[in-house]
Amino acid sequence: MAWVWALVLLAALGSARAERDCRVSSFRVKENFDKARFSGTWYAMAKKDPEGLFLQDNIVAEFSVDENGQMSATAKGRVRLLNNWDVCADMVGTFTDTEDSAKFKMKYWGVASFLQKGNDDHWIIDTDYDTYAVQYSCRLLNLDGTCADSYSFVFARDPNGLPPDVQKIVRQRQDELCLARQYRLIVHNGYCDGKSEQNIL
């Protein structure tokens, strides 16, 4: 009888794996995404890091939409250089629309040359516009369609974080992106508030 239960367990595990499709093309994004409602200030609460040097914590992003409907963003955060030099740095991004309202091509660069620059996919996986947002980008695909180098942010409107019911939604989205337990929490301790010029790049 034990072998019957073993088979049932294996079938259940196989079914769970089959349900989670980790090919990037299978990931769902926010339907009918509204850039205007998304604009404004967002605080990064958690991040799945990519390869390269990016903002590390105290990350605050400001999204805006111009009169032509073009979305752009600026972000400020702390970066640690040479293992012991903390500076506040700025990044800038411009977004090109695609056929899907929640999928963009984002050209980004650091105001300081040591930060990464590139032109990545930028997908809004989910948001309620007023509380939370989950962003995702795959920079390099594996041959099987899964992602070899990705990054993802969990944003909040409130710098103090997300309420428990929203955290549950966010964890579900992270799992759907096959990134469960791969995020690190982003500290907001005011490091980049009121810094003197020599500490800002």
Curated annotation (Swiss-Prot):
<feature type="signal peptide">
    <location>
        <begin position="1"/>
        <end position="18"/>
    </location>
</feature>
<dbReference type="GO" id="GO:0005615">
    <property type="term" value="C:extracellular space"/>
</dbReference>
<dbReference type="InterPro" id="IPR000566">
    <property type="entry name" value="Lipocln_cytosolic_FA-bd_dom"/>
</dbReference>
<dbReference type="GO" id="GO:0034633">
    <property type="term" value="P:retinol transport"/>
</dbReference>
<dbReference type="GO" id="GO:0034632">
    <property type="term" value="F:retinol transmembrane transporter activity"/>
</dbReference>
<feature type="binding site">
    <location>
        <position position="116"/>
    </location>
    <ligand>
        <name>substrate</name>
    </ligand>
</feature>
<dbReference type="InterPro" id="IPR022271">
    <property type="entry name" value="Lipocalin_ApoD"/>
</dbReference>
<keyword id="KW-0813">Transport</keyword>
<comment type="similarity">
    <text>Belongs to the calycin superfamily. Lipocalin family.</text>
</comment>
<dbReference type="Pfam" id="PF00061">
    <property type="entry name" value="Lipocalin"/>
</dbReference>
<keyword id="KW-0964">Secreted</keyword>
<keyword id="KW-0683">Retinol-binding</keyword>
<dbReference type="GO" id="GO:0016918">
    <property type="term" value="F:retinal binding"/>
</dbReference>
<comment type="subunit">
    <text>Interacts with TTR. Interaction with TTR prevents its loss by filtration through the kidney glomeruli. Interacts with STRA6.</text>
</comment>
<keyword id="KW-0488">Methylation</keyword>
<dbReference type="InterPro" id="IPR022272">
    <property type="entry name" value="Lipocalin_CS"/>
</dbReference>
<keyword id="KW-0732">Signal</keyword>
<keyword id="KW-1015">Disulfide bond</keyword>
<feature type="disulfide bond">
    <location>
        <begin position="88"/>
        <end position="192"/>
    </location>
</feature>
<keyword id="KW-0845">Vitamin A</keyword>
<dbReference type="InterPro" id="IPR012674">
    <property type="entry name" value="Calycin"/>
</dbReference>
<protein>
    <recommendedName>
        <fullName>Retinol binding protein 4</fullName>
    </recommendedName>
</protein>
<feature type="disulfide bond">
    <location>
        <begin position="138"/>
        <end position="147"/>
    </location>
</feature>
<dbReference type="GO" id="GO:0019841">
    <property type="term" value="F:retinol binding"/>
</dbReference>
<feature type="modified residue" description="Omega-N-methylarginine">
    <location>
        <position position="139"/>
    </location>
</feature>
<comment type="function">
    <text>Retinol-binding protein that mediates retinol transport in blood plasma. Delivers retinol from the liver stores to the peripheral tissues. Transfers the bound all-trans retinol to STRA6, that then facilitates retinol transport across the cell membrane.</text>
</comment>
<feature type="disulfide bond">
    <location>
        <begin position="22"/>
        <end position="178"/>
    </location>
</feature>
<dbReference type="InterPro" id="IPR002449">
    <property type="entry name" value="Retinol-bd/Purpurin"/>
</dbReference>
